[in-house]
Amino acid sequence: MWAQQPRFAEGLGPFSQVAQGAGYVGIEVSHLTDLGGFESLLNQSVLPVHSLHAPTPRPAAAARGLNLAATDEDERAAAVGSTVRTMDYAVRVGARFVVVHLGHISERLDEEDQLRRFFQQGRIESDEARATRDQAHRRRRELVGPHLTAAQRSLAELAEAASARGVAIGLENRLGFREIPSPEETALLLADYPPGLVGYWHDTGHLEVQGRLGLLDRQEALDSLGARILGTHLHDVQGLRDHRAPGNGESDWAYIARALPPAAVRTFEISGDEPETFIQGAIGFLARCGIL
């Protein structure tokens, strides 16, 4: 994400040089990267590409936002095809991992928006907030069934494609409550696949925000999936604003450090509006926290 800023618009080679100078040793290609930016990465030899975030390169407008959990079969199949395309690019650049958003419930859960307002008002522990959380969980349970079935089908097809290409799928936990999979759904999905083929990609900021809204227990969720973690997206949170540089927020990193397997890929997913000094300091900060 930090690569998506005007000074790197002409190519990501200069981004690679800045990243290397700050102490980073590899790159994840964001789903915001267009074909031109992707091709420029192929022409740099500064840092290896460890992972691709599907769909990469960024598809045409009509294909953006395709839902792997769609109940419409045409959309679901198109989303699978777009993700397999990313796997082909992963093979091309020698990346081992493809990070996947497995889709979402089509209906919005307005209760989550209300919880965000409660948080901003300092009322997240109020009776009204608790009632809103209960309603959010009830509505999600009522709506998720057909979408989870579609997501399972998509994952089966993607796992077959990944196995044929020698890459691994990392299922990312998402920011929105309507997104699939939840921690419980992730455990259910992963049970069908070997750890080296499909695993969990832990996004620290997304879990932190969900925890601050009271929608889940952060430590319980992470501990339940720790053994299946293939990689991470590391970023901090200010209030409910995620993708801050580690150290530029209020996240508790201690429980994360205890749960992360040593072999899990550590990827920094930092917003392009964070100052370069924070990018330079993030590695040292997380090393002191025991993450690196």
What is the meaning of each model-derived region?
Residues 32, 55, 103, 237, ...:
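Flexible loop residues that form catalytic
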Residues 1-85, 91-95, 120-126, 199, ...:
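N-terminal pre-domain/capping segments
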Residues 63-64, 130-135, 232-236:
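Short, basic/glycine-rich phosphate-binding loops at helix/coil junctions
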Residues 69-199:
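Active-site acidic/histidine proton-transfer and metal-coordination neighborhood
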Residues 1, 27-29, 49-54, 98-100, ...:
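Hydrophobic faces of well-ordered beta-strands that scaffold small-molecule active sites
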Residues 46-58, 152-158, 162, 192-193, ...:
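Alpha-helix-loop-beta-strand connector modules within alpha/beta enzyme cores
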Residues 5-20, 35, 85-96, 109-110, ...:
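Histidine-acidic metal/acid-base catalytic patches
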Residues 57, 176, 207:
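Active-site loop signature of alpha/beta-hydrolase-fold enzymes
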